[in-house]
């Protein structure tokens, strides 16, 4: 088992600011803002991390951590990188009130929870979790409600999701990556898109729903602020054409009350799930 130590922490700081030999290791650690503990084969992060009370950025990716370290009471931390570990649960984050970016990609998490204290969280990456057969990523309502006003970037790609309806209350979203999931219903997707009035970038490729006739056009009409869809810029003329067609031909994609996508023969929606 590889565990962190004061010596390892001192060796893992920025080359710009090396320790003054007149200072003890403990004194030095109290001054650092960035800590590079990535790719150290770490199984555990010890209590010595609490010495780093000015830490704003912590790199812990590409290790062997099975849980989020319990000593992360770092009140100044804004960026936490934990991707490529073996973490199975989101916990021990309640004291990180200034955290803005949380990277948890490629772990073993099946429930997105434990985010209640992250009142400034702007970016969350939980893509490509190692899930058991038949499982898909689950979202805790309380956690999502707590970040609904601040979260602008979310990556949930590669998690076997069959719907994005659990994410509808994340009304501050600007960028969402939901690619390579199992989303099938264009109706459900349209409902969600109508709730994300600020969404400018959306990735949905690699989902069965994109085999629906005119799927891209349906998405563009429902996501009125969208500028980029699957890495392709939506031109102003393209959007105007689709909106005019919708208004003139009666291709009714706008949802109100009990939502439903309808269309005329002219636009040929195909099979809507």
Per-range role (PLM):
Residues 1-64, 70, 74-79, 86, ...:
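Long, contiguous C-terminal flanking segments immediately downstream of a protein's structured core
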Residues 89, 111:
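Basic (Lys/Arg-enriched) interaction patch that binds polyanionic ligands
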């Amino acid at each position: 088992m590889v565990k962190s130590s004061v010596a390892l922490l001192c060796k893992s700081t920025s080359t710009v600011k090396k320790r003054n030999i007149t200072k003890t290791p403990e004194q030095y650690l109290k001054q650092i803002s960035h800590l590079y503990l990535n790719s150290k084969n770490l199984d555990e992060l010890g209590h010595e991390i609490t010495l780093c009370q000015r830490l704003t950025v912590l790199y812990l990716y590409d290790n062997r951590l099975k849980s989020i370290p319990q000593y992360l009471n770092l009140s100044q931390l804004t960026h936490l990188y934990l991707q490529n570990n073996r973490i199975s649960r989101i916990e021990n984050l309640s004291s990180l009130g200034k955290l803005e970016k949380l990277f948890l990609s490629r772990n073993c998490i099946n429930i997105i929870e434990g985010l209640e204290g992250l009142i400034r969280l702007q970016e969350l990456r939980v893509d490509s979790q190692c899930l058991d057969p038949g499982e898909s990523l689950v979202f805790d309502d309380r956690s999502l409600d707590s970040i609904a006003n601040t979260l602008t970037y979310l990556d949930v790609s590669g998690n076997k999701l069959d719907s994005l309806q659990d994410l509808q209350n994340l009304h501050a979203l600007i960028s969402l990556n939901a690619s390579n999931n199992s989303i099938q219903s264009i109706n459900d997707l349209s409902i969600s898109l109508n709730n994300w009035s600020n969404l400018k970038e959306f990735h949905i490729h690699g989902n069965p729903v994109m085999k629906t006739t005119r799927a891209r056009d349906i998405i563009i009409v429902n996501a009125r602020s969208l500028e980029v869809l699957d890495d392709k810029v939506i031109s102003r003329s393209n959007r105007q054409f689709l909106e005019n067609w919708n208004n003139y031909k009666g291709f009714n994609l706008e949802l109100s009350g009990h939502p439903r996508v309808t269309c005329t023969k002219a636009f040929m929606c195909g099979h809507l799930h």
